[in-house]
Regions:
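Non-transmembrane alpha-helical segments in soluble domains
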Residues: 1, 48-55, 71-75, 89, ...
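Active-site-adjacent helix/loop patches that line small-molecule binding or acyl-intermediate pockets
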Residues: 1-17, 45-48, 53
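Active-site Gly/Thr loop motif
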Residues: 8, 13-34, 38, 42, ...
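Beta-strand segments within the central parallel beta-sheet cores of soluble alpha/beta enzyme folds
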Residues: 12, 64-69
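Soluble non-cytosolic domains of exported or imported proteins
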Residues: 41-45, 132-133
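A general structural signal marking secondary-structure boundaries and capping sites
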Residues: 57-58, 146
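Structural helix-adjacent loops and short alpha-helical linkers that scaffold large soluble proteins
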Residues: 58-66, 133
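Structured C-terminal helix/loop/strand segments within mature extracytoplasmic catalytic/sensor domains
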Residues: 107-147
Length: 147
């Protein structure tokens, strides 16, 4: 994350009201938390920088940080799930957000945390603690406002 100017001092501090129930157990979650086998312990600005890296096809300034091949593969449907690439959700199939381009892709984290890449409009949208049934509506509103 140093190469994209992300902060190096951010720490996890759970919010007072960030408790979730998982399998009957109360678990504290934080936006971008990594309790569940993956995740990023970063703030919203750093999430946006991460998204910008992928919006720019793996380039940061004049330096390639992620290969073209990786970007291509991560945004192609996987064999087992047309709505999933390499660790990114795709706007296809059963996860399609109606009225939005199929080339949109996004990272989705526990607790309603999203980093959405909208290539056609050169947008990165970071959403925190949003109901997963509402994220498509939010993206549509942002895209429509950007037109």
């Amino acid at each position: 994350m140093d190469n994209i100017g992300a902060s190096s001092t951010w720490r996890w501090y759970g919010y007072d009201h960030s408790m979730l129930i998982m399998d009957g157990v109360k678990v504290q979650s934080v936006s971008g938390g990594g309790h569940f086998g993956g995740g990023l312990f970063i703030n919203s600005k750093d999430h946006a920088r991460f998204g910008l890296l992928f919006l720019r096809d793996g380039m940061w300034k004049d330096k390639r940080l992620i290969s073209n091949k990786w970007i291509e593969l991560m945004t192609e449907p996987s064999e087992n799930n047309e709505a999933y690439g390499y660790m990114w959700w795709l706007n296809k199939g059963y996860r399609k957000w109606e009225g939005l381009a199929e080339n949109i892709f996004y990272g989705a984290g526990f607790g309603g945390n999203y980093v959405v890449i909208v290539p056609d409009h050169q947008l990165v949208i970071v959403a925190r603690w949003i109901d997963s049934s509402k994220i498509g509506d939010l993206v549509k509103r942002v895209v429509d406002a950007h037109k």
